[in-house]
Amino acid sequence: MELQAQLKQYKPLNQQQMNEFIELLIADDISNEIKANLLSSFSEKEITQEELTYISKSLIHSMYRQQPYYPNSMCVCGTGGDKSNSFNISTTVSFVIASANIPVIKHGNKSVTSSSGSTDLLEAMGINTSSVEATPSQLNQVGLAFLSATDTYPIMKSIQPIRKMMTNPTIFNITGPIINPFKLDYQVMGVYETSKLEKIAQTLKDLGRKKAIVVYGANGMDEATLSGDNMIYEVNENEATKNYTVNPKDVGLAYAPNEALIGGTPLENLEITKNILTGVDRSAKRDVVVFNAGIALYVAEKVSSIKQGVIEAQRLIDNGNAIAQYNKMGGMTYDYIG
């Protein structure tokens, strides 16, 4: 297979070849073993920034001739694959920032490398994922929609068994958060590899984000963490890329090890999320949520700095707005009791 030979030689693919690569992965007449070899070969090579844009566009265009758009919409997500076994930080963050009247369209999946992905947590909460068609109406009603990648992109469902066969993260850990079905204005995305920071930031800009931050969490997490300096690449549609670091002390939070953020099963993570949103949990788990929510509020232009965003995120939890947002979603309901 010519394409596989090119991948084995670590040669970059152009847009046409990337389209062919995606077509091979979804073809019914090709075995999972061959697909796994293709995916492994692609994931072993160092992807270029252009290739990342190409594959993202290939995936989007395989499903949508024109992406749907909802004004000022945002997604907060990580690539996964960091093997930290943390609780569902970005899903918890989504409730907080949606309570600030930011239309949140979170594009998630079942976990591949941990015990609970965002879709697993939603099932435990009794919250249904939305369809692309129903999302605008849901945003108008409750300001937050969760989309399952395996529903919005059939390729994600078809390659799920292949990804399960593989021991290491694949390119789809990276592209999954990038290819939100909606053409977003804002995005915060976490990665577990520093080599991907600038490439992903530029790709998000290529895909039309007005403002976005890509963050590498201290000590290898795919969220901003409390254990040290977090590396950030920030892109704006009309400005040059900025890169800098931010640590908990910079935004008024205490240091804590990444081990303090460990979660568990979907039901255990539900309890963690509930305790944060109701104000019961005042531990490092709450702090990491307000840290990441603060970054998101800054990206969505609700505040002028990450530190102000952290203060606002704390207020949204402490005044009961965050748990009220959760209760709007139609799952189990709780009161603020902090």
From Swiss-Prot:
<protein>
    <recommendedName>
        <fullName>Anthranilate phosphoribosyltransferase</fullName>
        <ecNumber>2.4.2.18</ecNumber>
    </recommendedName>
</protein>
<keyword id="KW-0028">Amino-acid biosynthesis</keyword>
<feature type="binding site">
    <location>
        <position position="78"/>
    </location>
    <ligand>
        <name>anthranilate 1</name>
    </ligand>
</feature>
<comment type="similarity">
    <text>Belongs to the anthranilate phosphoribosyltransferase family.</text>
</comment>
<comment type="subunit">
    <text>Homodimer.</text>
</comment>
<feature type="binding site">
    <location>
        <position position="222"/>
    </location>
    <ligand>
        <name>Mg(2+) 2</name>
    </ligand>
</feature>
<feature type="binding site">
    <location>
        <position position="163"/>
    </location>
    <ligand>
        <name>anthranilate 2</name>
    </ligand>
</feature>
<keyword id="KW-0808">Transferase</keyword>
<dbReference type="GO" id="GO:0005829">
    <property type="term" value="C:cytosol"/>
</dbReference>
<dbReference type="InterPro" id="IPR005940">
    <property type="entry name" value="Anthranilate_Pribosyl_Tfrase"/>
</dbReference>
<feature type="binding site">
    <location>
        <position position="118"/>
    </location>
    <ligand>
        <name>5-phospho-alpha-D-ribose 1-diphosphate</name>
    </ligand>
</feature>
<keyword id="KW-0460">Magnesium</keyword>
<dbReference type="GO" id="GO:0004048">
    <property type="term" value="F:anthranilate phosphoribosyltransferase activity"/>
</dbReference>
<dbReference type="GO" id="GO:0000287">
    <property type="term" value="F:magnesium ion binding"/>
</dbReference>
<feature type="binding site">
    <location>
        <position position="86"/>
    </location>
    <ligand>
        <name>5-phospho-alpha-D-ribose 1-diphosphate</name>
    </ligand>
</feature>
<feature type="binding site">
    <location>
        <begin position="81"/>
        <end position="82"/>
    </location>
    <ligand>
        <name>5-phospho-alpha-D-ribose 1-diphosphate</name>
    </ligand>
</feature>
<feature type="binding site">
    <location>
        <position position="90"/>
    </location>
    <ligand>
        <name>Mg(2+) 1</name>
    </ligand>
</feature>
<feature type="binding site">
    <location>
        <position position="78"/>
    </location>
    <ligand>
        <name>5-phospho-alpha-D-ribose 1-diphosphate</name>
    </ligand>
</feature>
<keyword id="KW-0479">Metal-binding</keyword>
<comment type="pathway">
    <text>Amino-acid biosynthesis; L-tryptophan biosynthesis; L-tryptophan from chorismate: step 2/5.</text>
</comment>
<dbReference type="InterPro" id="IPR000312">
    <property type="entry name" value="Glycosyl_Trfase_fam3"/>
</dbReference>
<feature type="binding site">
    <location>
        <begin position="106"/>
        <end position="114"/>
    </location>
    <ligand>
        <name>5-phospho-alpha-D-ribose 1-diphosphate</name>
    </ligand>
</feature>
<feature type="binding site">
    <location>
        <begin position="88"/>
        <end position="91"/>
    </location>
    <ligand>
        <name>5-phospho-alpha-D-ribose 1-diphosphate</name>
    </ligand>
</feature>
<dbReference type="Pfam" id="PF00591">
    <property type="entry name" value="Glycos_transf_3"/>
</dbReference>
<feature type="binding site">
    <location>
        <position position="223"/>
    </location>
    <ligand>
        <name>Mg(2+) 2</name>
    </ligand>
</feature>
<keyword id="KW-0057">Aromatic amino acid biosynthesis</keyword>
<feature type="binding site">
    <location>
        <position position="109"/>
    </location>
    <ligand>
        <name>anthranilate 1</name>
    </ligand>
</feature>
<dbReference type="GO" id="GO:0000162">
    <property type="term" value="P:L-tryptophan biosynthetic process"/>
</dbReference>
<keyword id="KW-0822">Tryptophan biosynthesis</keyword>
<dbReference type="InterPro" id="IPR035902">
    <property type="entry name" value="Nuc_phospho_transferase"/>
</dbReference>
<comment type="function">
    <text>Catalyzes the transfer of the phosphoribosyl group of 5-phosphorylribose-1-pyrophosphate (PRPP) to anthranilate to yield N-(5'-phosphoribosyl)-anthranilate (PRA).</text>
</comment>
<feature type="binding site">
    <location>
        <position position="223"/>
    </location>
    <ligand>
        <name>Mg(2+) 1</name>
    </ligand>
</feature>
<keyword id="KW-0328">Glycosyltransferase</keyword>
